[in-house]
């Protein structure tokens, strides 16, 4: 950085410390990843200076011809990546994308089905603390108490009983394959619209490692970071018949000018995801997650639902007398970044929780393979076995540092 150190030394110091944190810790938060230098360059471009209210060819400001080129490329690449007729790349986040869809097909007070946050859903799927749970009438569905997988019989029963206008499929802490075809059958029976939130699994869907809802669902939303390895942002996919209503709900419905520098970075990320090596990356993400889950099971820990089909593992740490908060805080101190997470039928409040959520996208981007993930999994277990033993902490921290030094972060930094 050439100008920031002098212009704002306090911000510069904080950014340098964040660089060091990412370099010296193993990032295992399932919703985080590392963008490429190309994505980072697009994100920090002069497009941040340009206002471009409207859509390509229909802007409210002049001087948008370059912005039009960038947004059109992002749209076409997103459509190609997911095999979709329509794409809106303007949502600032996944939450904004979800709200735009709600506004497109629901009126205040209308009911919709969404996965219970306590069972792995997302805030925007009807949590009472979120606007989706305040404006509309959410009907939560959950997982089976024995298998800890989505209870499709319950979904069908609730749909028949409440006749919702919309059924939302998707999760933020669910490690198993989602059967979109079952949701489609249920929605058809009760005459409901369908929305799939694939924020966590979009990279898997794009590469064919998870069934796609495209063609079955009316609306598909996702974030552009997580497994897609793009900038933080949102994306809506649908059919051409929904283009007008969705465009209007994004702008001017809930947003003003789009973030053109972010859209440029999205376009670069979509292009990267269209390359053959991206599919190999997702293969490794899945292999790493499977290895991690297997290590936990071998070491006597309980993995929610017994394993994983995707990029994340939900681990019940209560079997070791720990809360999720204690486990996450302790792991942070030895160099592993995870988040506390509620597990299905959790007796602890969300701020305490009984589990931790771990993901493999960021470490896979960093270069770790299954053999490395086995080492990481064992180090995590070593710590959780004796979290208050100072000698054990020192040993585990040393092992983590060896791993971070083996896989440096230089390739993700701008000079």
From Swiss-Prot:
GO BP: any one term: tetrahydrofolate interconversion
Positions bound to (6S)-5,6,7,8-tetrahydrofolate: 117, 121-123
Sites of N6-(pyridoxal phosphate)lysine modification: 226
Alphabetized PROSITE patterns for the sequence: SHMT (PS00096)
Keyword Transferase attached: yes
Catalytic activity: (6R)-5,10-methylene-5,6,7,8-tetrahydrofolate + glycine + H2O = (6S)-5,6,7,8-tetrahydrofolate + L-serine
Record's GO cellular component terms: cytoplasm; cytosol
UniProt cofactor(s): pyridoxal 5'-phosphate
Assigned EC number: 2.1.2.1
Subcellular location: Cytoplasm
Gene3D superfamilies the record matches: Aspartate Aminotransferase, domain 1, Type I PLP-dependent aspartate aminotransferase-like (Major domain)
Entry GO MF terms: glycine hydroxymethyltransferase activity; pyridoxal phosphate binding
UniProt keyword terms in alphabetical order: Amino-acid biosynthesis, Cytoplasm, One-carbon metabolism, Pyridoxal phosphate, Transferase
UniProt record similarity statement: Belongs to the SHMT family.
Name used for this protein in its record: Serine hydroxymethyltransferase
């Amino acid at each position: 950085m050439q100008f920031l150190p002098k212009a704002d030394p306090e911000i510069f110091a904080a950014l340098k410390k964040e660089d060091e944190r990412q370099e010296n810790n193993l990032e295992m938060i399932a919703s985080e990843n590392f963008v490429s230098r190309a994505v980072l360059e697009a994100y920090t471009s002069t497009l941040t200076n340009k206002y471009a209210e409207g859509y390509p060819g229909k802007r409210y400001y002049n001087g948008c011809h370059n912005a039009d080129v960038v947004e059109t490329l992002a749209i076409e690449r997103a459509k190609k990546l997911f095999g979709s007729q329509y794409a809106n790349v303007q949502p600032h986040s996944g939450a904004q994308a979800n709200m735009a869809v709600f506004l497109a097909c629901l009126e205040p007070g209308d009911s919709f089905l969404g996965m219970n946050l306590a069972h792995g859903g997302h805030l925007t799927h009807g949590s009472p603390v979120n606007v989706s749970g305040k404006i509309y009438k959410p009907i939560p569905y959950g997982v089976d108490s024995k298998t800890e997988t989505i209870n499709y019989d319950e979904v069908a029963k609730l749909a028949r009983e409440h006749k919702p206008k919309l059924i939302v499929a998707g999760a933020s802490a669910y490690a198993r394959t989602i059967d979109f075809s079952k949701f489609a059958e249920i929605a058809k029976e009760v005459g409901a619209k369908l929305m799939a939130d694939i924020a966590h699994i979009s990279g898997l869907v794009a590469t064919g490692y998870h069934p796609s809802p495209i063609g079955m669902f009316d609306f598909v939303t996702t974030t552009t970071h997580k497994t897609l390895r793009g900038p933080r942002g949102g994306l809506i996919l649908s059919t051409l018949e929904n283009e007008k209503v969705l465009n209007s709900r994004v702008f001017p419905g809930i947003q003003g000018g789009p973030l053109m520098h972010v859209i440029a970075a999205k376009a670069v990320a979509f292009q990267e995801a269209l390359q053959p090596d991206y599919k190999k990356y997702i293969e490794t993400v899945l292999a790493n997650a499977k290895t991690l889950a297997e290590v936990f099971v071998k070491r006597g820990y309980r993995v929610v639902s017994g394993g994983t089909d995707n990029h994340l593992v939900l681990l019940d740490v209560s079997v070791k007398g720990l809360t999720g908060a204690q486990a996450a805080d302790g792991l942070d101190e030895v160099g592993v970044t995870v988040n506390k997470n509620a597990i299905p039928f959790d007796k602890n409040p969300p701020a305490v929780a009984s589990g931790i959520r771990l993901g493999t996208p960021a470490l896979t981007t960093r270069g770790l393979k299954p053999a490395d993930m086995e080492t990481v999994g064992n180090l995590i277990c070593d710590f959780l076995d004796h979290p208050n033993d100072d000698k054990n902490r020192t040993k585990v921290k040393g092992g983590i540092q060896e791993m971070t030094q083996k896989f440096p972060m230089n390739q993700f930094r701008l000079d």
